[in-house]
Amino acid sequence: MAKRDYYEVLGVERGSSEADLKKAYRRLAMKHHPDRNPDDKASEELFKEANEAYEVLSDASKRAAYDQYGHAGVDPSMGGGGGFGGGAGGANFSDIFGDVFSDFFGGGRAGGGGGRGGAQRGSDLRYTLELNLEEAVRGTNVNIRVPTLVNCKPCDGSGAKKGSSPVTCPTCGGIGQVRMQQGFFSVQQTCPRCHGHGKIISDPCDSCHGEGRVEESKTLSVKVPPGVDTGDRIRLSGEGEAGTQGGPTGDLYVVINVREHAIFQRDGKHLFCEVPISFTDAALGGELEVPTLDGRVKLKIPEGTQTGKQFRLRGKGVAPVRGGGAGDLMCRVAVETPVNLSKRQRELLEEFRTSLENDESHSPKASGWFEGVKRFFGDL
């Protein structure tokens, strides 16, 4: 099968710059690399094709020969340039595109810091703190126990036995990176001996085995301000994992999770609750006590109250953590139908029902609904 035009393979114009070629190649290689597409022969062939095209077009002399003579100008069997060394196994995926991924993800683990080698910031930690609604609304002080990594005391975080110190890595010369030739690529990789630190420990500390850090659980006091809600974060600066090679300590983020309440539901600064009332109180009106976070308050129920009616108790909600006035407590009435009636109670209700017959003024919604039903069926 005839080879495709190399510019077509990369999806660029013939006059494209070296930067455009590189950008197009990386996009294709990231998409079709075998590490991303295992057992996908089609992607493997596209990756090889992109490698071949980029090797030629990224080399000024090969590109000139290709532009003048086409594939014949770079085909060794026809007296052209050298062969292709990339192939599907050419360069390591993570090494070729490490700088691309650094742009996407900021490099390394979330909360880490610094470049390769040398001092690196410790990772940030996350701790989920469960609170009940009252604690979240009023604020509280809580002691938490957090597992973390701290500097090893015997070696003071160096990883080397007392009396010794880390030495410059002979493999990378202290840079933390080595340059390797893989196919037609020359790529920079993390030094396999010092793992990017630039130094090695020839006599490791017995306590941390050369790591410079050890696991430890810390007890911390967390001051929770009033008004927090699920998802709010409290940052404890410097309470994360210890850094390496003398790097700064990370932070601890305490993430709030407020448990469900038996009575109240929260929406921002407002609270909601359902208040059951008897149908006699709903019909005749009355006064009842309802709970709030500050204690019980009296709520006046007017006569003729229907299920779903909502009453607002101003200022009985939550004062937001970021300031502002307290929200309201919204009490939604739910009229209960009586059950387990005595004989006398049933008789009274029967009398009451009889007294309502043919008098629609007592149930305006019901009468209106029935009228609507009649019109509906009359239109069919």
UniProtKB/Swiss-Prot annotation:
Q: What does this protein do?
A: Participates actively in the response to hyperosmotic and heat shock by preventing the aggregation of stress-denatured proteins and by disaggregating proteins, also in an autonomous, DnaK-independent fashion. Unfolded proteins bind initially to DnaJ; upon interaction with the DnaJ-bound protein, DnaK hydrolyzes its bound ATP, resulting in the formation of a stable complex. GrpE releases ADP from DnaK; ATP binding to DnaK triggers the release of the substrate protein, thus completing the reaction cycle.
Q: Its Gene Ontology molecular function terms?
A: ATP binding; heat shock protein binding; unfolded protein binding; zinc ion binding
Cofactors, names only: Zn(2+)
Q: Where are the zinc fingers (CR-type)?
A: 139-217
Q: Which family does it belong to?
A: Belongs to the DnaJ family.
Query: Subcellular localization, per the record?
Result: Cytoplasm
How are the domains described in the entry? The J domain is necessary and sufficient to stimulate DnaK ATPase activity. Zinc center 1 plays an important role in the autonomous, DnaK-independent chaperone activity of DnaJ. Zinc center 2 is essential for interaction with DnaK and for DnaJ activity.
Q: How is the cofactor bound?
A: Binds 2 Zn(2+) ions per monomer.
Q: Could you read off the lineage of the organism from its UniProt record?
A: Bacteria, Pseudomonadati, Pseudomonadota, Gammaproteobacteria, Pseudomonadales
Gene3D superfamilies assigned to the protein according to its UniProt record, in alphabetical order: DnaJ domain (1.10.287.110), Heat shock protein DnaJ, cysteine-rich domain (2.10.230.10), Urease metallochaperone UreE, N-terminal domain (2.60.260.20)
Indicate what this protein is called per its UniProt record: Chaperone protein DnaJ
The primary location reported for this protein is cytoplasm
Question: Which species does this protein come from?
Answer: Pseudomonas syringae pv. syringae (strain B728a)
The gene that this protein is the product of is dnaJ
